[in-house]
Amino acid sequence: MKMAAPTANKAASLGCNNKPAFPELDFRSGARVEELNKLIQEFTKHDQREYDDQRALEIHTAKDFIFSMLGMVQKLDQKLPVANEYLLLSGGVREGVVDLDLDELNVYARGTDYDMDFTLLVPALKLHDRNQPVTLDMRHSALCHSWLSLRLFDEGTISKWKDCCTIVDHINGATNYFFSPTKVADWFYDSISIVLSEIQKKPQRGMPKVEKVEKNGTIISIILGVGSSRMLYDIVPVVSFKGWPAVAQSWLMENHFWDGKITEEEVISGFYLVPACSYKGKKDNEWRLSFARSEVQLKKCISSSLMQAYQACKAIIIKLLSRPKAISPYHLRSMMLWACDRLPANYLAQEDYAAHFLLGLIDDLQHCLVNKMCPNYFIPQCNMLEHLSEETVMLHARKLSSVRSDPAEHLRTAIEHVKAANRLTLELQRRGSTTSIPSPQSDGGDPNQPDDRLAKKLQQLVTENPGKSISVFINPDDVTRPHFRIDDKFF
């Protein structure tokens, strides 16, 4: 898909060697490209949080609490797989790390409500056995969506999940069970609530404080207070698959920016069904295909300057285009991936081109709105903006036009917002208003608390892998051992 390219006017000397060159300007806004680059660098500096040893320990304590909670959920009714494989992503659902609808999500703000956010994909069904027949029924769904029939599963699985299915009786007397995203989410929220209630009856020293538990559509959002930090976990029940869906097979035949940088096996190692339906889909039955695991791999091939431009652009549009709901950060992420395919790698690798990339992303987004066309990166025949009204797309296109006319001012506003969020976080840390956790060296307390070696190990992982997504393998019968996979490395 062809999209608009960034507009920039290279310096010229008016044909006279003895005259100084003009500064490089953005043709549309007149902004100096050098100034835009500096503003993006300043935004990046304030947006990226540095973790000291205490913060690293708090991150691990929160993660361990969440995994322990999920282990107890599994033991409630044995529905979840005994040895499960979670995908932990840095950034919450509202940040666009997964293609989920944001309409039903409560608004949380960094600094006001939380300091760090994560998304955790938790397989309710883990279909990794290639001998397990699976029926993805796409006859009733829009592109990139599917129903999941349990008809070919064993009786034990059907019996276990029957209360989370919609049941369809056929004329021939056969009964079909369709795994219901809404019923699974209801069960998951109820189970988590029961477990948290039990945990809070027997509080242990150093245990995180559960500040908020809310069901946002099909997502369960938990905010934990740990030491001086508040951490938001958006927990999403999913169906996990190995391999690659047939509907996305043609995408593999095309040339892509990641060719030769990572292997095809890394990209197509698996996919998910996430609990979201299409605009006209049946909420109780329809799931959305998600390639979150593949996106973790693709992210490794994106230049730092393009990623900085993406983060700055996301910060600008996330509030500007929040009402009416039409554009999510995931749309912007898809456009960035298309840009990586479209543009030469050596162009995208230039460190001082963040301003050009930011302007290009704004142009691309406006182009997509005006044409009401944003193809899914993995299933291009799926237009993610198809359902929007002409009135909505033109409203947002006009808002983006104001950004494009003065990108520097909108960058300054984004910088002020992130600085204000950081000030709120620092103020909370000074007040020490959340539950304090003991230091690893302190005497007494729960013997299962992380020790100093674990804190140092976690700090090392965080330092060496800033912003990376983490896969976690966990056995609910043994949650005391770390089970990290950061990209393709195991720890």
From Swiss-Prot:
One GO MF term on file is: cadherin binding
Q: Which UniProt keywords apply?
A: Nucleotidyltransferase, Phosphoprotein, Transferase
Residue(s) carrying Phosphothreonine: 435
Q: Which residues carry this modification: Phosphoserine?
A: 436, 439, 442
Top-level taxon of origin: Eukaryota
Q: Which InterPro entries match?
A: Mab-21-like_nuc_Trfase, Mab-21_HhH/H2TH-like, MAB21L/cGLR
**Gene3D superfamilies noted in UniProt:** 1.10.1410.40, 3.30.460.90
Q: Which residues cross the membrane?
A: none
Q: Region (Disordered) spans which residues?
A: 431-452
- Tell me which Pfam families the record gives: Mab-21, Mab-21_C
Q: What does this protein do?
A: Probable nucleotidyltransferase that catalyzes the formation of cyclic dinucleotide second messenger in response to some unknown stimulus.
State the name under which the record lists this protein.
Nucleotidyltransferase MB21D2
Origin species: Homo sapiens
